[in-house]
Amino acid sequence: MTLSPEDLKTIEKYAYQNAVKYGKAPQPKAVMGKVMGECPQLRSDPNAVSEALKVIIPEIAKGNPETWETKLSEIAPELIEALSVKKEPDKGLKPLEGAENGKVVMRFAPNPNGPATLGSARGMVVNSEYVKMYGGKFVLRFDDTDPDIKRPLLQAYDWYLDDFKWLGVVPDQVVYASDHFPMYYDYARKLIEMGKAYVCFCKGGDFKRFKDAKQSCPHRDTSPEENLMHWEKMLAGEYEDQQAVLRIKTDIKHKDPALRDWGAFRIRKMSHPRPEIGNKYVVWPLLDFAGAIEDHELGMTHIIRGKDLIDSEKRQGYIYKYFGWKYPRTTNWGRVKIHEFGKFSTSTLRKAIEAGEYSGWDDPRLPTIRAIRRRGIQAEALKKFMIEMGVGMTDVSISMESLYAENRKIVDPIANRYFFVWNPVELEITDAEPTVAKLPLHPTDHKRGFREIAVGNKVLVCTEDVEKLEVGSIIRLKDFCNIEITSLSPLQAKLSDVSLEALKKAKAKIIHWAPLDGINVKVRGPEGDLNGIGEQGIAAELDKIVQFERFGFCRIDAVSEDEIVAYFAHK
């Protein structure tokens, strides 16, 4: 049979779905099974489908997980949705396969090119929780051997340590990969001597052509002695930037191009931001090489990482095989998409901050741990949020509202209540006498005490509340008095003798308010800044979480004579 254009589109979309799901080139058998299961009309000629896949899959394999997801979202967005877990991810932490109490060693290995993001937080929490579960050893390892593309940010090292402290985690060991160049060089020499690594002088495009054609490049069969000579020249700085690459010799005819003679070291004549390293080295290990050596030297028993790094395990497997090492048990998990932030990377965030688009790494609009901490998100809420995602291959699509719900459980019982009036309008109560309003600090915990506000015959209310009023409207100023609107311009009212019970029965509006002598308050949040007037008592809550009634929970960030700055957490 001849496949129609629609048939080919169907085969293509399922091939892309397979690539997105597993983070690697589509697997023909899996795609074939999916196509046959979903498309009965194609079952009569599996050979035609197989031949189509021989054309489609190599083209897809040229891309990467990001381009695959973009393409799939264009041609079959419903299949993207099918891969995402919407509400209840694979909750909780399942037992680690092969784990023994007291013998588990795990690591979290960030590139410190910026602070921890919400993406990083998953690895920070899950790895440390597993180690705690088994009474093992937890290692924080900074994979900081990329001097240019993902160049380390010096402050980020301390930021990670601070975020771990906030999470209540003290790593058993902190490792800086950039301290271990001599060790990497020693292992590289051993591989060269074994004939398992060689110095390649091909330009990038030339080597790719050899690799794609499954052919050896002219340098692949150079003797170990000559390769050692070139290697020492690389280390001595006798070659120019990117003139030579040390490659691990694998299977040049391997079906997966990503595994063919992959690069382990490159020349970059750049300084490292850590002063201890500076300009000491010109030959830099790539992540797959450095990570493989580190995981062995540190005695890792289990590794959890993204499914987009499945090929890393396969590449590193060659090194482990050559040295006779046992590879750690590895679990790959799916990507996490947080609706409110979409796709983001530390590199793009860093560029935006340097361009002045954000005030810093703790700008409330950013998906960093520093930002959500400043907003008042509690460590236990973040930990529970991350743990409940589970550890599975399926991509997780989740909302910050789930995190906010966990945080609300923690802060609602402890947050004192205050009034904050944004976009304020003056309201005159023509027959009111000066008094002192007494309001509870917490609606269900009166033992905590009360706040007292001196009030004359004028208060401030929100513009959006005023817009809903009419002359004759009877409303309640929360925890103060009942009033009847007598004029909208100017805004005036008189005291009303309607009982509170009658107001409730009539479902009359209850609005909050602020005194004329209140303090200026600026609330910073994901949607931008909002200015208004708040109670003077807010000034006593520096660095604490409060609830601005009818607005939301906020953390009081700064207090001065002129202004209070609060960071919005959530409703």
Curated annotation (Swiss-Prot):
Protein biosynthesis recorded as keyword: yes
Cystine pairs: none
EC number(s) stated in the UniProt entry for this protein: 6.1.1.17
GO CC annotations, alphabetized: cytosol
Keyword tags: Aminoacyl-tRNA synthetase, ATP-binding, Cytoplasm, Ligase, Nucleotide-binding, Protein biosynthesis
GO biological process, one term: amide biosynthetic process
Gene3D superfamilies in UniProt: 2.40.240.100, HUPs (3.40.50.620), Ribosomal Protein L25, Chain P (2.40.240.10)
Localisation: Cytoplasm
Domain of life, source organism: Archaea
Entry's Gene Ontology molecular function annotations: ATP binding; glutamate-tRNA ligase activity
Predominant subcellular localization, coarse grouping: cytoplasm
Positions of short motif 'HIGH' region: 110-120
Classification via InterPro entries: Gln/Glu-tRNA_Ligase, Glu-tRNA-synth_arc/euk, Glu/Gln-tRNA-synth, Glu/Gln-tRNA-synth_Ib_cat-dom, Glu/Gln-tRNA-synth_Ib_codon-bd, Rbsml_bL25/Gln-tRNA_synth_N, Ribosomal_bL25/Gln-tRNA_synth, Rossmann-like_a/b/a_fold
Catalytic activity: tRNA(Glu) + L-glutamate + ATP = L-glutamyl-tRNA(Glu) + AMP + diphosphate
Keyword Ribosomal protein appears in the UniProt entry: no
Function: Catalyzes the attachment of glutamate to tRNA(Glu) in a two-step reaction: glutamate is first activated by ATP to form Glu-AMP and then transferred to the acceptor end of tRNA(Glu).
Family label: Belongs to the class-I aminoacyl-tRNA synthetase family. Glutamate--tRNA ligase type 2 subfamily.
Protein name, entry field: Glutamate--tRNA ligase
Species name: Methanosarcina barkeri (strain Fusaro / DSM 804)
Organism placement in taxonomy: Archaea, Methanobacteriati, Methanobacteriota, Stenosarchaea group, Methanomicrobia
Gene name of the record: gltX
